[in-house]
Design a protein with these regions (language model features):
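Conserved catalytic-site region of short-chain dehydrogenase/reductase
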Residues: 325
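Flexible phosphate-sensing "switch/lid" loops adjacent to ATP/NTP-binding sites
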Residues: 1-315, 332, 360-362, 372-500
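Conserved phosphate-handling catalytic cores of large alpha/beta enzymes
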Residues: 223-226, 329-345, 354-368
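Catalytic nucleophile serine of serine hydrolases
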Residues: 320
Length: 500
C-alpha cells in the first residue's frame, strides 16, 4: 500500500536474512524519486534500494532498480533505464512506451536472482491501483514475473487499516489474491492486544494471515518518506543553526543527514525568508531543475535574503545544482530544463566565479579525492580526504586557483582534476561542489561545526568524530531486532519455502 513503509520493511527483512546467513538482495523494478545514487559502474539508481543493499551488506547494483523516474515538473520525469537516462517524458508518453521496458525488468531480476539466495522485491504505491494496472511490472505484475509470494504492508497510523486491507485484497484478481500469503500491519502505536479481535476478523474474512504488527519505530534510516517527517518536525534552533533551502525540486537531501548526529546542531529545511532566520550556514542543495528552482528563489525573495546573509559573513554552501546557482550564469543551449528546446541563459547569484553550461550527456561517477587549500572559515578542511559521487548535466568553468577539491574517478584510474569553487576575496565564506556525500567523510562535518562555533567564540569539547557508516550499521541492526521481535519470521520462512 502507498506510503505504508514498504521500503523500511524491505530493508529490515534484508538485514534479518543477511544475519541468518543468506545472500540477499533488494529489488524494485521501478522507482520514482529525486534521491538517486551512482554505482561503482557509473549507473544511476534510486537511493531506497541503496539503503536496502546496505542493510543486506552488499554493494548497490543498478540491477536492483532497473527503472528510475526523476520528476522534472508536475507532469514529466526523466526516465532512467539500467542506470542511463533515455529522455524526459510526460506521463502519457511514458505509459505508452512502458510495455517495451518489461524485458529489461525481467532481465535485471533474473540476473539478480541467479546470484542470490533471496531477492526481496518492493512494490510501488498500491497493488490495487486498477487505473494503471495495464502493463504493470511493479506490483502484482512483478510478483507474477518473479513467481514470488507476496506480503501486503498496511499502515495503521493513518486509520482505516482493516478497510484498506480488505479493499485492496478484494480489488485483486483471483489468481493475484492467491499469491498474497501474509499481511504486515506497520506503524502501530499502543497495546497490540487491542487489535487482536480485528486481526482475527480480517483473517477470517480474507483467508490471509497477519504475520505481524510492527510498532512505530524510531530508527534513523533514510527513507523515501522521511523528508516530510523531518520537515514537519520543526527543529528548535540550537547552538549551531544550519538552514537547508527547500527548493521545489530538491534532490539528494540525504547529503546533510550527518549534521543531525552532532550535539548542539539544528538542521532545518526552510522555504521562506521568515523561516530562514539567522542561520550560521545556509546550504543550497541539489535539484532536478536548476534554473527553475533559481527562479523560485528569486520570486520568493529567498535569493535576496541569501545574498544579504552572504555579504554579512554567513557561510553559504552549494551542492550540485545549488553550486551551479551560486555562479555568474547558467547556459542551457538546448532548452532542456524549461522544456522549450530553445537556447537560453539564466543569470546566477554571482557569489562564485563560475559559469555553467548544460550538455546533453549526464556525468554519473563515483569519485574520491581531497579538499584543496580551503580559504576562510573552513580552512581546517584543507587536505582532508573526501569521497562521494556526481550526478549532473552541467560543465562548470572556474579559475583553477579557486578550486575547492581535487578528485578522480574511483574505478577507472582517471586523472586528478580540480573541482568545486570558493570565493577567495572578501568574506571567504561561499563554497560549492558537485560532490554528493561531501559531508559524510570522517571528521568533515565535525570540522565544519567546529569552525562555525569558533566564529561565534565558542567550542564544543565533547564533539567526537562521527563514523557515519558504523552509525548506519547500528540503525539497521535496531530495525532487524524490531522485525524479529514483531514479525513471525518462522511463518515468513515457510512462505518463502512454499513459494506460489
Amino acid at each position: 500500500m502507498s506510503n505504508a513503509g514498504k521500503s523500511l520493511v524491505t530493508a529490515g527483512l534484508c538485514r534479518v536474512f543477511n544475519q541468518d546467513g543468506y545472500k540477499v538482495a533488494p529489488f524494485k523494478s521501478q522507482n520514482m524519486a529525486l534521491n538517486s545514487f551512482i554505482t561503482a559502474e557509473g549507473a544511476e539508481m534510486g537511493r531506497a534500494q541503496v539503503v536496502q543493499a546496505e542493510a543486506a551488506d552488499i554493494e548497490p547494483s543498478v540491477l536492483m532498480n532497473p527503472i528510475l523516474l526523476k520528476p522534472t515538473s508536475d507532469s514529466g520525469s526523466q526516465v532512467i533505464v539500467n542506470g542511463e537516462a533515455i529522455g524526459t517524458m510526460k506521463a502519457g508518453e511514458y505509459y505508452a512506451m512502458k510495455h517495451t521496458l518489461r524485458p529489461e525488468v525481467q532481465k535485471a531480476f533474473d540476473t539478480l536472482a541467479s546470484k542470490f539466495d533471496i531477492v526481496c522485491i518492493e512494490g510501488a504505491g498500491s497493488p490495487a491501483e486498477i487505473n494503471i494496472k495495464k502493463d504493470d511490472f511493479v506490483n502484482m505484475g512483478m510478483a507474477k514475473m518473479a513467481k514470488a509470494p507476496v506480503l501486503l504492508v498496511a499502515d495503521i497510523d493513518r486509520g482505516g487499516v482493516f478497510a484498506s486491507i480488505y479493499g485492496t485484497l478484494m480489488l485483486l484478481e483471483d489468481d493475484e489474491r492467491e499469491m498474497v500469503k501474509g499481511v504486515i500491519i506497520n506503524k502501530f502505536r499502543g497495546d497490540v492486544e487491542i487489535l487482536r479481535p480485528g486481526l482475527k476478523m480480517i483473517e477470517d474474512k480474507t483467508g490471509v494471515p497477519i504475520v505481524g504488527v510492527l510498532p512505530m519505530l524510531k530508527v534513523d534510516i533514510e527513507d523515501e518518506d522521511s523528508l516530510s517527517e523531518r520537515i514537519s518536525g520543526r527543529s528548535e534552533v540550537k547552538l549551531i543553526d544550519i538552514a537547508v533551502v527547500r527548493i521545489p525540486r530538491m534532490s539528494n537531501y540525504t547529503d546533510f543527514n550527518v549534521f543531525e548526529l552532532i550535539p548542539g546542531v539544528s538542521l532545518r529545511y526552510v522555504t521562506s525568508v521568515r523561516e530562514l532566520g539567522q542561520p550560521d550556514m545556509i546550504i543550497i542543495p541539489g535539484t532536478k531543475n536548476t534554473t527553475g528552482d533559481l527562479k523560485w528563489l528569486r520570486q520568493s525573495g529567498m535569493e535576496a535574503a541569501i545574498l544579504k546573509h552572504a555579504n554579512s559573513g554567513t557561510v553559504v554552501f552549494g551542492v550540485c545544482g545549488g553550486y551551479q546557482m551560486l555562479g555568474k550564469q547558467i547556459s542551457d543551449p538546448y532548452g532542456e530544463e524549461d522544456g522549450t528546446g530553445k537556447a537560453n541563459v539564466t543569470p546566477g547569484m554571482g557569489l562564485l566565479d563560475i559559469e555553467t553550461t548544460f550538455i546533453e550527456k549526464k556525468r554519473t561517477i563515483q569519485m574520491a579525492g581531497k579538499f584543496g587549500q580551503v580559504q576562510g572559515i573552513f580552512s581546517a578542511l584543507s587536505g582532508l580526504p573526501l569521497y562521494g559521487y556526481e550526478i549532473h548535466s552541467g560543465v562548470t568553468e572556474f579559475p583553477e586557483e579557486k578550486a575547492l577539491t581535487s578528485i578522480s574517478p574511483i574505478h577507472d584510474n582517471g586523472e586528478i582534476m580540480a573541482e568545486g569553487s570558493q570565493n577567495t576575496e572578501g568574506k571567504l565564506n561561499v563554497y560549492g561542489t558537485y560532490v554528493h556525500g561531501v559531508f559524510d567523510g570522517d571528521g568533515i562535518a565535525v570540522k565544519i561545526v567546529e569552525a562555525l562555533l569558533a566564529k561565534k567564540g565558542k567550542k564544543m569539547d565533547d564533539i567526537q568524530t562521527i563514523n557515519f557508516a558504523e552509525y548506519k550499521r547500528q540503525q539497521y541492526d535496531i530495525l532487524a531486532d524490531s522485525i524479529r521481535e514483531n514479525l513471525d519470521m518462522k511463518k515468513i520462512y515457510e512462505i518463502l519455502e512454499a513459494g506460489v
